[in-house]
Amino acid sequence: MRLVISLIAGVLIVGCSSQSNQHDIQDRVSSGSVLFLRGDMTNWDALPEYKVQQTSTRLFSVKANLPEAGKTYHFKFADAQWNPSMNYGTAIDDAALSLNRPLPVRAYSYLDELKFTPEQAGTYEFMLDFRGHKPVALVKLAQ
């Protein structure tokens, strides 16, 4: 019985610490840590025009022109220094974003790039959304 209680306590502690860690990361983004859209469209550089802006509580976005329809663009949300805790990529192996459909993301994603293939050339809004239980990325056609 003690073993069962110990196992349950361990699971609860680990679950709480990972949830707390996720909130710490969200709070850092909210409180001034600067993220950029970094990828094929920026030559993987942290360019000022691709700085992610907070658009509402726990929601961040940036617009980017994608000039080639049908081309797969690889990208991440990351700070200028590629700090692991501020390096967001896909949480699902080899998953691709579809227009207007959220995809889970995670920090500490060293090689897990996000990817999106637009059906038409144009300006798109890339969003990082912390409002739900787990963070997601979303791409919309900009208005």
Predicted regions and their residues:
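Aromatic-rich carbohydrate-binding modules that target alpha-glucans
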Residues: 27-70, 80-106
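Short, exposed beta-strand-loop hairpins at the edges of beta-sheets
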Residues: 115-141
